[in-house]
UniProtKB/Swiss-Prot annotation:
EC number: 2.7.2.3
Binding site for ATP: K197, E314, G340, G341, D342, T343
Gene coding for it: pgk
Main location: cytoplasm
Species classification: Bacteria, Pseudomonadati, Pseudomonadota, Gammaproteobacteria, Pseudomonadales
InterPro entries reported for this sequence: Phosphoglycerate_kinase (IPR001576), Phosphoglycerate_kinase_CS (IPR015911), Phosphoglycerate_kinase_N (IPR015824), Phosphoglycerate_kinase_sf (IPR036043)
GO cellular component, as recorded: cytosol
Name of the molecule in the record: Phosphoglycerate kinase
Similarity-based family: Belongs to the phosphoglycerate kinase family.
Enzyme class at the top of the EC tree: transferase
Length: 387
């Protein structure tokens, strides 16, 4: 992937507009989870160190486009940045017709989704964004799969359009895992439905050596292999699809599972051999023997891609499978990449973030990249680099 990189540019005295993903949860006017802001900070600091006049933009939530809403304001993010950087970070609401920023200064623009035409990627709005800067930096991998005014349109019209360090690192890590992975490669794909991850499963089946499935997805594969799944969540209409995938790649199946009679925090967990699953059982995790088997497979892998917990880990009695695999990935010498919202929550819960080679900040963008789809915001940066 050939894109201009912000790290290679001379930014001294330049007006630099950086698109970050600062779409963080806010509770009572305070940032509730700062992971995305922390991921963006090095880029912002680097632009300031390079002597740029720095303008940062992002979306937050899903406001009605073109209308201000206090609950979707980036004010809590501006407050957080001021504290984190030890300097005043003004939140600018009216910026489309120009804003005064000096070299070494930093401002945060109000939610881009308050601007009409943002989601439709309107040229008129994109040209206004582009006119604000000498250099546009796309650093928000989490929104790279969306062609919007502040992610794609502005890159079309800006004098210079480059990838920020965070975006560049995501693309490098994903390329390393998917374009020419060190072998053997194992992928863990879990979730409630095969239908939502079908493209991911198909794409990975052609690059990985072991495809470990979990959650409702695993139940569909178990049913395809003729095993009882009781009243577990599965998709009978996709049994043939599961068979076709299993014919292309090794899909190791659970030999034991953790079941319950109901889906609840107070539900009693019972370990059963797969053949003993009763008609009124719900499979909510992989069993200890299966977890040990899968951990052994991961130990011998050189590349690991992890998307999704293998059980209902939010309830501790159904979290052991995910915990064992998380620890196995952490202990492995393989290049490991993890992505997707629930996966990040599991990484947090089991404290393995430092041992995973790369944790992707993008949910939908991560999955679309794995599916082999073109990410519009990356494609436009490549086009501009060629020109």
């Amino acid at each position: 992937m050939t894109v201009l990189k912000m790290t290679d540019l001379d930014l001294q005295g330049k007006r630099v507009l950086i698109r970050e993903d600062l779409n963080v949860p806010v509770k009572d006017g305070v940032v509730a989870s700062d992971a995305r802001i922390l991921a963006a900070l090095p880029t912002i600091k680097l632009a300031l160190e390079k002597g740029a006049a720095v303008m940062v933009c992002s979306h937050l939530g899903r406001p009605t486009e073109g209308e201000f809403s206090a609950e979707n304001s980036l004010k809590p993010v501006a407050d957080y940045l001021s504290k984190a950087l030890g300097r005043d970070v003004p939140l600018v609401a009216d910026y489309l017709d120009g804003v005064a920023v000096q070299a070494g200064e930093l401002v945060l623009f109000e939610n881009v989704r308050f601007n009409k035409g943002e989601k439709k990627n309107a040229d008129e709005l994109a040209q206004k964004y582009a006119a604000l800067c000498d250099v546009f930096v796309m650093d928000a991998f989490g929104t790279a799969h969306r062609a919007e005014g502040s992610t794609h349109g502005v890159a079309k019209f800006a004098k210079v359009a480059a990838a920020g360090p965070l975006l560049a690192a995501e693309l490098d890590a994903l390329g390393k895992a998917l374009k020419a992975p060190a072998k053997p490669m194992a992928a863990i794909v879990a979730g409630s439905k095969v239908s939502t991850k079908l493209d991911v499963l198909n794409s990975l089946s052609s690059v990985c050596d072991q495809l470990i499935v979990g959650g409702g997805i695993a139940n569909t594969f178990l049913a395809a292999a003729g095993h009882p799944v009781g009243k577990s969540l599965y998709e009978p209409d996709l049994v043939d699809t599961a068979k076709a995938i299993a014919a292309k790649v090794s899909v190791p199946l659970p030999v034991d599972v953790v079941v319950a009679k109901e889906f609840a925090e107070s539900a009693e967990a019972t370990v059963k051999a797969i053949a003993d699953v009763a008609a009124d059982d719900m499979i909510l995790d992989i069993g200890p023997q299966t977890a040990a088997n899968f951990a052994e497979l991961l130990k011998s892998s050189k590349t690991i891609l992890w998307n999704g917990p293998v059980g209902v880990f939010e309830f501790d009695q159904f979290g052991n499978g995910t915990k064992v695999l998380a620890k196995a990935i952490a202990d492995s010498a393989a290049f490991s990449i993890a992505g997707g919202g629930d996966t990040l929550a599991a990484i947090d819960k089991y404290g393995v973030s430092k041992e995973i080679s790369y944790i992707s900040t993008g949910g939908g963008a991560f999955l679309e990249f794995v599916e082999g789809k073109v990410l519009p915001a990356v494609a436009i940066l490549e086009e501009r680099a060629k020109a």
